[in-house]
């Protein structure tokens, strides 16, 4: 139920409100992600870089409450690395023996820490805008990965004659072209441990890959199972056909 509620919330926030996003945005171009297509898979290096972008840039405003720290084991990080990452965050636990809530370092089993305790605090810190949870954001609309990549790289100067409202920012791909979120990606805004140049396009591609995985972490397993089922059905079909030919071989038509 929480996943369904998150999808509904993400979809409502992804769509533009009447006052802020009248009109429609053009269809985003195909970013040619490696996980797209029937045989697509997630690149572990891109996932780890994408998590770094989320952690260092996006997590200041956006939660991912559908993920626990232990899920980071699935993107190729070691248990020691994940424990170190989790321990950087304080979470509320309790009550203790005295009936008091207390703060402690996060564990593998804890969900990602939220940047704000509630919606009101989030809006107060963001000029009234509510940063949506990103757990299933890529699934919130059709072609979500391509749209999100285009959105993150779509901050440009407004065309002549276009007036941008106070507190809004012009984006070529957002419906209505005016969005409350500022351009958060800057060249070399993060320093990748593997030496990959941290261009805006690379950061956008990596964090989109991470968010696509977060929205559907079972994607690779499901596709492998689909291939296995197709192979099984092909073999079964061949056996059934061969059996039919043998059983009916002596029957005259």
Residues of each region from the PLM?
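Bacterial N-terminal signal peptides that target proteins for export
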Residues: 1-11
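N-terminal signal peptide c-region/cleavage motif recognized by signal peptidases
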Residues: 16-18
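The canonical Cys-X-X-Cys-His
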Residues: 54-65, 207
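Membrane-proximal low-complexity regions enriched in glycine and acidic/polar residues
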Residues: 90-178
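Juxtamembrane interface at the cytosolic side of transmembrane helices
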Residues: 222-225, 231-253
């Amino acid at each position: 139920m929480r996943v369904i509620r998150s999808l509904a919330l993400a979809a409502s926030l992804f769509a533009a409100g009447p006052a802020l996003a009248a009109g429609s945005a053009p269809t985003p171009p195909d970013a040619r992600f490696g996980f797209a297509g029937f045989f697509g898979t997630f690149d572990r290096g891109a996932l780890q870089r994408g998590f770094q972008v989320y952690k260092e840039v996006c997590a200041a405003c956006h939660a991912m409450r559908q993920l626990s720290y232990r899920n980071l084991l699935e993107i190729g990080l070691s248990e020691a690395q994940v424990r170190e990452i989790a321990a950087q965050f304080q979470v509320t636990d309790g009550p203790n023996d005295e009936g008091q809530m207390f703060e402690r370092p996060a564990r593998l089993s804890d969900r990602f820490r939220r940047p704000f305790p509630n919606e009101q605090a989030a809006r107060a810190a963001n000029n009234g805008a509510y940063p949506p949870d990103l757990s299933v954001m890529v699934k919130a609309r059709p072609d979500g990965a391509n749209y999100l990549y285009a959105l993150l790289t779509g901050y440009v100067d407004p065309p002549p004659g276009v007036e941008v409202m106070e507190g809004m920012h012009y984006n070529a791909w957002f419906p209505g072209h005016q969005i409350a979120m500022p351009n958060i990606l800057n060249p070399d805004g993060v320093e990748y441990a593997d030496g990959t140049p941290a261009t805006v396009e690379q950061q956008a591609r990596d964090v989109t890959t991470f968010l696509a995985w977060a929205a559907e972490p079972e994607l690779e397993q499901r596709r492998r199972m689909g291939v296995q089922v197709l192979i099984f059905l092909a073999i079964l079909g061949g056996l059934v056909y061969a059996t039919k030919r043998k059983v009916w071989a002596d029957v005259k038509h």
